[in-house]
């Protein structure tokens, strides 16, 4: 049994995977304001069934190293299993990193690429919608073709609120156009702008991918964004965790 953890900037996604990989238990835990690593680990423990006894705890984390070390210690105390961290490298689990400096690639993107390799061996364009939106290409030989980074909806809202004197930090959501209030105008502008940016970036990256490349979308905002894209896009909400599992199995066979 494995416990898979995707520690993003806004929330933790988790999955408990039994031997054989069938019947995943999954969930999401948003970080509480002011909560430290120990409190966060305790909150996570409250979400995961008490019967879970993982042989391995596999982690992809974008959080600060000092915070992460304390969190790892709390995980080991709670579950006893060793904590294994995926880190971006030149190559892993059949994927070759396309960055000039491989360690610069975010580990969440690296995990998503490994997951995409497992589910789309013909190649893929991967969109990950989180605090930031990333778009990456993968060819049929497992080579990462590079990608792009764009601010997510929350960052776009915050940029308008902080960079102007009178625009509010309005709620995220769709709105009709033409909008008839400032809040609706911001919501519509961000939603349509982010969708258009993703479409343009994905089209450019797909041009470098094999003709049969799959279109995969993941991340906390992936479902909402996918609803506004063409039906060719496949929503895989746990692609990062799928990549973690594939990497962990690959490492176990080495």
From Swiss-Prot:
Its cofactor is NH4(+); K(+). GO terms for cellular component: cytoplasm. It comes from the Bacteria. The keyword Nucleotide-binding applies. The active site is at residue 108. CDD domains: ASKHA_NBD_PanK-III. It catalyses: (R)-pantothenate + ATP = (R)-4'-phosphopantothenate + ADP + H(+). Substrate binds at residues 99, 106-109, 182. This is Type III pantothenate kinase. It comes from Halorhodospira halophila (strain DSM 244 / SL1). The gene is coaX.
